[in-house]
Amino acid sequence: MSKTLSFKTYSAKPADVERKWYVIDAEGQVLGRMAAEIARVLRGKHKPQFTPHVDTGDFIVVTNAEKVALSGNKENLKTYFSHSHYPGGVRVDSVKDLLRKKPEKIIEHAVWGMLPHNNLGRQLFRKLKVYAGTQHPHEAQAPTEMKIH
């Protein structure tokens, strides 16, 4: 008798997932390309046991957020729009202002737009840590450096 072949789809369990820590230096990196790679790793799509409804991704620490590069003339033209839901509560911030005040928000906003907008996406987003300088408080996790091409 020959053994029958099984074609069952593997579904990852949260307990089976091994998480790694990566650190990315944002200096000179193009924002959109870097954000796409970060979203892919946060989601876990780089792993063979990727399962769409399970958090299989890794942690990412981004440093030098204030030195991120934008292609074209986006530094002068791109704006971020938000509203407080009160009359006259419109707020429009330019990239130039955000780079000066809160450079972490630019990377967080770009990555959030590339993640699922549901409970899983919020859980994935919590694994992203962005810092303006070169220092970060995650040395104890021994993150490995990730290069983005």
Swiss-Prot record:
It comes from the Bacteria. GO terms for cellular component: cytosolic large ribosomal subunit. SUPFAM superfamilies: Ribosomal protein L13 (SSF52161). Gene3D superfamilies: Ribosomal protein L13 (3.90.1180.10). GO terms for molecular function: mRNA binding; structural constituent of ribosome. Belongs to the universal ribosomal protein uL13 family. Part of the 50S ribosomal subunit. NCBIfam families: rplM_bact (TIGR01066). This protein is one of the early assembly proteins of the 50S ribosomal subunit, although it is not seen to bind rRNA by itself. It is important during the early stages of 50S assembly. This is Large ribosomal subunit protein uL13. It comes from Chlorobium luteolum (strain DSM 273 / BCRC 81028 / 2530). The lineage of its organism: Bacteria, Pseudomonadati, Chlorobiota, Chlorobiia, Chlorobiales.
